[in-house]
Each structure stands twice: as C-alpha cells, then as structure tokens.
Swiss-Prot record:
Its cofactor is Mg(2+). One of its GO terms (molecular function) is magnesium ion binding. The gene is pnp. Residues 561-620 form the KH domain. It is an enzyme of class 2 (transferase). This is Polyribonucleotide nucleotidyltransferase. The lineage of its organism: Bacteria, Bacillati, Chloroflexota, Chloroflexia, Herpetosiphonales. Mg(2+) binds at residues 494, 500.
Amino acid sequence: MSEQQVHSVTVELAGRPLTIEAGRVAQLANGAVLVRYGDTVLLAAVTASAEPRDGIDFFPLTVDYEEKMYAAGKIPGSFFKREGRPTETAILTSRLTDRPLRPLFPKGYYNDVQVSITTLSTDQVNDPGPLAIIGASAALVISDIPFAAPVGAVQMGHIDGVFAVNPVMGLMENSRLDLVVAGTSEAVMMVEASAYELTEAEMLEAVKRGHEAMQAVIQAQLELAEKCGKPKKEFVAPVVDTSLQDEIKAWMGNRFLQALNNSDKAAREAATDSLRTDVLEQFSAGVAEEELAARVKAVTKNYDALVKDEVRASILEQGIRVDGRKVNEIRPIAVDVGVLPRVHGSGLFTRGQTQVLTVATLGSPGDEQRLDDLGIETTRHYMHHYNFPAFSTGEARPSRGPRRRDIGHGKLAERALVPVLPEKDKFPYTMRLVSEVLASNGSSSMASVCGSSLALMDAGVPIKAPVAGVAMGLITGKEAGQFSVLTDIQGLEDALGDMDFKVAGTTAGITALQMDIKTTGITYEIMQQAFEQARQGRVFILDKMNEIINTARNDISQFAPRIITLQIDPSKIGALIGPGGKTIRSIIEQTGAQIDVEDDGRVFVTTPDADGARMAQSLIEGLTREAKVGEIFTGKVVRIMPYGAFVNVLPGKDGMVHVSELDEKRVENVEDVVKIGDELTVMVIDVEPGTGKLSLSRRAILTGETAEQRKSSSSKGGPRGGGGGGDRGPRPGGDRGPRPEGDRGPRPEGDRPREGGDRGPRPGNGGNDRRGGGFRG
C-alpha cells in the first residue's frame, strides 16, 4: 500500500463544523471518506465493477446504510450479541441516500456500483441521515467512478415559527416540520418531509432555504476532489441505432396509437406486448443467427423508445394522456368503509385501477412498538404497514416478506397521518394500520394514505381532520422551460416521466411530502406548480372521501378492547405492582384485563368487556387511593384483638377500630360487639402521617359526631364508663397479655398518688420505659 496521505476539508454548517476526510481509511475502495459533524462520525465507501453487467437495461446501484450499536456505546440485545438485519431506520436512510445520487450517473452506465455507509459514532445530537447523503456523494466525487456533480443535504425544521437548518435532535420534537432536502449546486434533487399542516408556500420556502444552506457542503466536496480526487474512468454510453425507429413506426401505422391509448392497464399492456412481438418478428426475419440477439435488442430498444416518445409528445403537445385524461385530471374514485365485519376499522379506496384496502386494529398501550437502535430508546403507538403482493400488478412471483420499497411506502403513509392523530393522553390506544394493495396502476402509496384516513375514522379514532394523498408527475421537453405537471400519475407515466412528487395532507396543509426525479434537477417554478396542482387534487379527493365519511364514528368498534385511564400517585406504583409483581398479576387473573403502568402514575386498563374494566378499576383504586379523614366505609371485620377490631375498608387496606370507638358505652370484650366476618360501618377519624395507618370509629356513626370531634375527644381523655373517650390506645406489639397469677402484686412503698405527680416506676420495668411505648399521657 502506498504511503498514507490524509486530506480533509471543514465547513461550518448551522453553526457547527462539518469535516470530510479522505485517505485515512478504506484505501482499497474506489473512494472513501469519513464525515464528522459534532461527535457523529460516518464512513462512506464506494466501489464499482470493472465491467458492465450483461443482459440488463437498468443501472445496478446498491446503497447500504448500516447502524453499528457500538456507535452509541451499546451492545446488541439479540442472542448472538451482534447486529442483525437492517433496522427500519437503516432501510429508510439507504433509500434516502439512493434517490438523489441515482440520476447523476451517466445514462447507459450498467456497471455494478455499491455505496456502503456505516455509522461509527453518534452523539444523539446530530442526525446521521443527511450526513449519509453527504458522505456517499463525497466518496463518489473523489472516486474514479463516473458521477456528474456533488450532492449536498440538510435537515430543515420549523421551530417556534422560525425555519432552522440542521436543528439538534432534541429540538425536532417540537418542530412543525422534518424535511430532508438534497441537491446539486444548481437544482434540488430530492425532498422528503413530514409536517404539521404546513402550507405549500411554507414548504417551498423551507426547500429553498435548505438548498441555500447546502451550498457550502457542495463546495467543500469540490475542494476535496481537487486535493485528492482520482481521474474519472472514461465512459462512453452505448450507441443505440435509432435508424429503425422511422421504419418501425411506419410499419405499425395506426396499430401503435390504438394499442397505446387505452385507459385499461391490462388491455393496453396486452396490446402493446402483442404489437412488440409482431415488430420483432417483422424486423428480425432473415437475420443471421449470430446477429439475431443484437438485432432483437436493437428492435426492442427502438420500440420502447417510440412508446416513450409518443406518450411524452402527446402530453406536451396536446395535453392528453394515454388514458384520455387532461394533465390535471384525477381518475375515477370509489370510497367505502366498514367493509370487513370483525375488524376494528376498514377502508377501501379505489382510484382508477389502483385499489388499496386498509385495516385498522386498536390495541393496548402495552402493544406499542419498542424501538432500540442508535437513537434514544422510544416507543411507537401508531404503525402503518404496506403490503404489495404480486397479484396487484398481475405478476406471478414468490412473496419473501416486505421489501425496501414496501417499508418506504409504509413509512410515508405513516408520516402522513401522524400529525392528525389524537393526543395519547386522550386516546391511549396503540394503532396498527395495514394497507393491502389489491391492484396497482400507480400511486399506491398515496392510496394507502387515503385508505388509512378512512380506516381510522371507521375505527372511531378521533383524528383532527381527514387526510388524502396524490402523486404528481412531470414531463419535460427538449426546449428550455417546456414542461407539463401531471396530476395523479399512473404506472406508465411514472415509468416514462421525469418526476414522482407525492403530497399528502388535509385541507389546511401538507402532512407528508416525497419527491424523486430522474433528471439532473427541477426548478422552483416546476415545484411551485406541482404544489398547487397537488393541493387542488388533494381537496378534490377529500371531497369524495367526505361524501362517505368525514369524521370519526361516535364510538370504537364493539370488537375493539376498552381502555380506562387512571391516575395514581407515583409513590403507589409499588403497592399496585406488589412484591415480584404478585399484586398486579392477581388483578390481571381476576379481571382478564391487561394493565400497563407508566412512570408518571398513569395506569391503562385494557379489557375486552366493561365488567372486567370496572372490576379492575375498583381494585386498582382501592390499592392506590388514600382514605381521607371523615370518609365513611362499610367493610368486613378481618381481625380481632383485645384492644380493638381491624376492618377492611379498601382493597388491601385495613384500619383499626379501637375498643373505645366500638360503641357508645364502655366495651369490656371486643367480641361482645363484633366478630370476624361481620360488616361494620365506620368513619376514618385519623390517618397517621408517614405510615398511612387508619384509625376508625364506629362510635362516630352511632353518635353522629364528626371525625374531628371523635379525635379531639379521644385525645383529651374522659370518663372510663358511660362512653367517655380518652383510652390509652393499643400498645405496640399487641396486648400485654395476662398478668402473672392473675394479680399485679403489691404496690411498692405505699399507695400511688391520686392527684398529680408521677405514678412512679412500675416494678421490673426500668422507670419510664414501657416496652417501646413512651408515656400514657
């Protein structure tokens, strides 16, 4: 290995230094950099195959973002104690990085390119997401891999009414906006955002400010390339013989437009495939066998180019799309809710030949998803999962679980609904939504947004406002400024167009945004028009949805669990849980309830029926509530002692009725008045500070006295007979027991004084010591 030479550049971004360093690590990669922002450090390394992959017509780019637990000072919690398959965050970051880079590779470049990004250190302050894009771009810029221009990226927030560039992670909790924008020095390449109903103007302003802020990072990459960049490998795009296009078009005649202009996806694909087969037979006939493969490839490319040119030309020149719609026209919409009988909520949304069934399930707080990755350990009480089976596009392929695309689409729809969800304190349910794509002809992720809104309202979730989504497309012409923005794109327009611009929101504003492009950037003029057409389309779709359901049902489904929220003193959590969880398990067994206890004293009781909920509530309140002086209880006598009776007044809580408080008259024997199992109505006359021990009185109930009167009478003392209070109270440790041989023995040295003075020490008791009890008073 040659002598190590380290090169670095540092710029200030949002008031903090960002450093990109090359040459220290991964020297065998085509390009590698370390990116440091605060104490967050990422490694980005890129490699490319020496030769293009045979038999493909797409660019094989792979982006892998990996989170290493050591970066946060953690040991993986799995059995094997090592990182497993990528987390959701890792997959989303991989997709986020891929999208702005892909359009900047030359067309026809079919070499395998792998971008590997690893988080080596994280400070829980600076989000690694935008840094992954910067690192990948910098590694490509200094490598010998053909790549058009450096890409910068920043995160934008909107906190306290002010836009913020790269706010620290803690501040994002209070932000109305979470936007990642990436671009070159000239244009925006990628946008991904979730927002709390920002207007189109606010969102566009955030994109502009983000694009301005990233310029310093772009310039830093160029400076690094000047210091240590490798010469780019020479690449010449394969030449496609277009001479056949005119011949093929002339031979097809009217069949071409007849096959292409069809609103039915299946019929159109069948017609165009049949026509392609006929074209191949016609223009491959008589070709020598050794030249046949090349001829078939050339004819296919020419035919596909004709399809693309015709679709785009019709839109740009006539404003007409292949299914006959105008550029701002939305496909026919059908909406239904409550389509499944036993689920908690369901919505069926159909737009053209795209159809999504979304099902809502309500669970207990304990059903929350627990997240433990490089971020702070958190929980998620709202989840959306997106499934895209092969039959939805008429294909036959095995299902191997969710793909990256499925996870990305599911997360986009999830973000779109989060801003309108009720606060957890008011609606403590865990919500899981699953969108099943039943048919797909473009924009299935936005159909999932609409289906989610319908399913939530059908489930009785009090969302703040319905949410809808629409996907916008773009067709650009060869002349400068020639473009057409399409509303509600279908699959063919997505494949042959230049942009996929997805916007979700309410009538008040945007809640989610995602933009991908296939060109080297779009102008703000295009973006502004796309925002406005998306707003109009969103309002149109919401009107259609509101005709069926426009607010949450009055109650949740009869098949959904019921949740009661209780607030207890946090100091009582231990009493509720009990030693080793014994108490709370007992309640769960008795009631069939699921009980979740928060550190702040909130208790969530989830049961399938109201009776179990009420029983659990009663038991919990009894265990955790404090009896107050003056309260009256009716409870059973659970224990009798010579000095009084113990009565159970609350679950797990007994109080003592002293012998002097059992009756109006003097009581010689407690069992003359009550027996174990008897019900007794008593009043709380004192609660001992610190211990919470209860002093009870039956006498107050009989005489009509208040707790204060009984407590005062007891403390002052009084005649022993005829109901006078003032008894000495129980001795610690129980009764003194019977006197030896029935008599206390003679008094020492004469009689004790009758009036005043001290009684003198008791024989054999050491003066004032009364076995731990102090003076009688």
